[in-house]
Amino acid sequence: MKKIVITMCACALMAGAVSCKKEKIDPIEQDPVPVYAEGIYHPVMKLATVTEDGVLTQEWNWVGDNLDKITSPDGGATTYNYTGNYISKVSTAGDQTEELRYYYDESNKFTKCEIFYDGMQAVTMNLTHNAAGKLSGAEVLVEDSFLLSLASGLLGGGSLFEQLVGRQAAESMIIMAKLQHAKNPKFTMGSKEFGMVLDWNGENLSSQVINGNASIILDTNDLNLLRMFIDIPEEYQGLIQMVMALQGGLPLTLTLNDTIACTYDTNYNPFFCNWGEIFSHRNLSLNNALTMTNTGAVKIAASLMGQTMDLYSYPLSDYQEYEYQYNEKRYPTKVSSGTEVLYTYKQ
């Protein structure tokens, strides 16, 4: 049995932060990331830093067969390697290592990104292009969500979507900007572990759980919606916590038949939710009012747009120490705070 102890702010659990204040990441401060290269694919490659609106702010060329390694301009612990098949970006923080592999085809189109933590793959992202060579879709598959979230906490990750596209705000924004102008764009996010898939076609966002009974239908064309509902520090990126992160009066319907437990911070945001047999409530329903109740022994009611909310039995302090225990497959088995066991997981 392995143990890891993380001390964080309760409302930023697993987010790698020590402050409850949510601050926007400035893309200009991010490490340079690969964007669409112009000219010959090999041996010329361009790397650039982009702003939120996709404007290049820094660019340099990577030229020649003999130049197989470059480092970030600030001399930080980030190294780029060209293997012949992909660009490998390796970053270190303490004894943790993150590797991003950016794949390009012979016409310089960015086609795939893979994310590894300590040599273990967490995410695969595939990009599709139309006949004109423009980006038309993105598919993100979570290979190991616990590994992804654990790395997020230790490496100081941002929103889940930023992690899924390489924990780069600039990269995620330019991808979404290109999708915004694509004809019939498609975005798919799924988890191989939990059989989840979530699709967005530019107008509607729908979701289903393959190995369960849950469905979500969101009627909106707001591109920022993705970043809003995915920006949750949660190790099981389940469907309920995504919905609960929504702010505002978006048309929303959620019906599910499963066991859910959620804890909320003082700003009515869930910082921990779990699909597990923790409580015995069933047949939950969440509609436009964004209020959830249950018929079991524990009442959970929250309104993200309203003024009131009921928390179940344990108080939230500004800072708590959480101890995560997990098995040899890297799945959590227990969450504790001091001597109090907060959650146990069905194995």
Residue ranges and their predicted role:
Residues 1-4, 22:
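Positively charged n-region of N-terminal signal peptides that target proteins for export
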Residues 4-13:
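Sec-dependent N-terminal signal peptides
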Residues 16-19:
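C-terminal motif of bacterial Sec signal peptides marking the signal peptidase cleavage site
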Residues 22-347:
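Buried hydrophobic residues that stabilize the cores of well-folded domains
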